[in-house]
Amino acid sequence: MQQASPTAIARILDANLNRAREGLRTVEEWCRFALENRELAEECKQLRQALAPWHQDDLRAARDTPNDVGTQLTHAQEALRTDVRALLQANLCRVEEALRVLEEYGKLRDPAMGACCKQLRYRVYALESGLLGSKLVQRLQQCSLYLVTSPQENLLATVEAALQGGLKLVQYRDKDAEDQLRWQRAKDLRELCRQYEALFLVNDRVDLALAVDADGVHLGQQDLPIAVARQLLGPDKIIGRSTTNPEEMAKAIAEGADYIGVGPVYATPTKAGKKPAGLEYVQYAVTNSPVPWFAIGGIDGENLGEVMEAGATQVAIVRAIMETTNPTQATAQLLTQLSRINP
């Protein structure tokens, strides 16, 4: 293997810094002048500014555009932009690819550069979701409380009571029922959620989500790859993924999860035998997840405060609603607690 010269590394870094910053500026102009979205425009600007210190004079000096063989390489798709969405998608992909190159080759120059570009890449994933994400995903981002159901005879009544308490996000979870029963319950829950303008997701089963026209699906670590689920569900449905550690989080984000579950925070019978990830993982998610995430696992009204203190703003609940005698009141109280950080 030929040893790469410092000049070659410098040229790679220079080209990809240019590529990333140009792509971000293209996206920023749309956010600023067309959408007039201050938050998205500011994020683009901050990303550009975070890259600027790494674009040092020696990298610029290594540039050799006249002799760069890549300047003559073109693809027919480069000249085609069917609409603004396609333009934005192309530039965001360009930025993500450039940041990956900077992450890898930057390590050869300065490990801190590689680490910085890795975090910036995750932020671009979040920017892409906020800019191009479906209306369903945008609604999910506004949900602070997420009910994951458990099997019971009065399932519909319990869920409706929670919806009456202000709940806006429900996941139907039943690992053991026969498919005919699961389909009927999922269909009934979907209709109920629509009456209350709440989102409805199905646990694990992409086929069931499709059969009842759910708003999306939540996948475990052993379920279908996100890319396969996306191909089946289409671009607008919500796809979530359970994660229990930083490695699973990074993989889910890279694969395109719209949101992730972070936990189990505490021991819970719904994850029997699973060691709790603890509040440490919640704290990790605060600074490392660019996509929406819900703390999950053994959370109730008594320990919600410390989960919030660890940085969680969105939580998923099972027993604290499903097993209470007054789901409406329990839901309202949980939402009141969460409203202290989600005014």
From Swiss-Prot:
Alphabetical list of InterPro entries matching this protein: Aldolase_TIM (IPR013785), ThiamineP_synth_sf (IPR036206), ThiamineP_synth_TenI (IPR022998), ThiD2 (IPR041397), TMP_synthase (IPR034291), TMP_synthase_cyanobac_bac (IPR016229)
Enzyme Commission no: 2.5.1.3
Cofactor(s) annotated in UniProt: Mg(2+)
Amino acids binding 4-amino-2-methyl-5-(diphosphooxymethyl)pyrimidine: Q171, Y172, R173, D174, K175, N203, S242, K271
Any single Gene Ontology cellular-component annotation: cytosol
Pathway: Cofactor biosynthesis; thiamine diphosphate biosynthesis; thiamine phosphate from 4-amino-2-methyl-5-diphosphomethylpyrimidine and 4-methyl-5-(2-phosphoethyl)-thiazole: step 1/1
Entry keyword set: Magnesium, Metal-binding, Thiamine biosynthesis, Transferase
Residues annotated to bind 2-[(2R,5Z)-2-carboxy-4-methylthiazol-5(2H)-ylidene]ethyl phosphate: T268, P269, T270, G298
GO biological process, one term: thiamine diphosphate biosynthetic process
SUPFAM superfamilies, A to Z: Thiamin phosphate synthase (SSF51391)
Reaction(s) catalysed (UniProt annotation): 2-[(2R,5Z)-2-carboxy-4-methylthiazol-5(2H)-ylidene]ethyl phosphate + 4-amino-2-methyl-5-(diphosphooxymethyl)pyrimidine + 2 H(+) = thiamine phosphate + CO2 + diphosphate; 2-(2-carboxy-4-methylthiazol-5-yl)ethyl phosphate + 4-amino-2-methyl-5-(diphosphooxymethyl)pyrimidine + 2 H(+) = thiamine phosphate + CO2 + diphosphate; 4-methyl-5-(2-phosphooxyethyl)-thiazole + 4-amino-2-methyl-5-(diphosphooxymethyl)pyrimidine + H(+) = thiamine phosphate + diphosphate
GO molecular function: hydroxymethylpyrimidine kinase activity; magnesium ion binding; phosphomethylpyrimidine kinase activity; thiamine-phosphate diphosphorylase activity
Binding site for Mg(2+): D204, D223
Region ranges (Unknown): 1-123
Domain of life assignment: Bacteria
Chain segments carrying region Thiamine-phosphate synthase: 124-343
Cofactor binding note of this UniProt entry: Binds 1 Mg(2+) ion per subunit.
Annotated NCBIfam families: PRK02615.1 (NF002727), thiE (TIGR00693)
Family: Belongs to the thiamine-phosphate synthase family.
Function statement: Condenses 4-methyl-5-(beta-hydroxyethyl)thiazole monophosphate (THZ-P) and 2-methyl-4-amino-5-hydroxymethyl pyrimidine pyrophosphate (HMP-PP) to form thiamine monophosphate (TMP).
The name this protein goes by in its record: Thiamine-phosphate synthase
Originating organism: Synechocystis sp. (strain ATCC 27184 / PCC 6803 / Kazusa)
Lineage: Bacteria, Bacillati, Cyanobacteriota, Cyanophyceae, Synechococcales
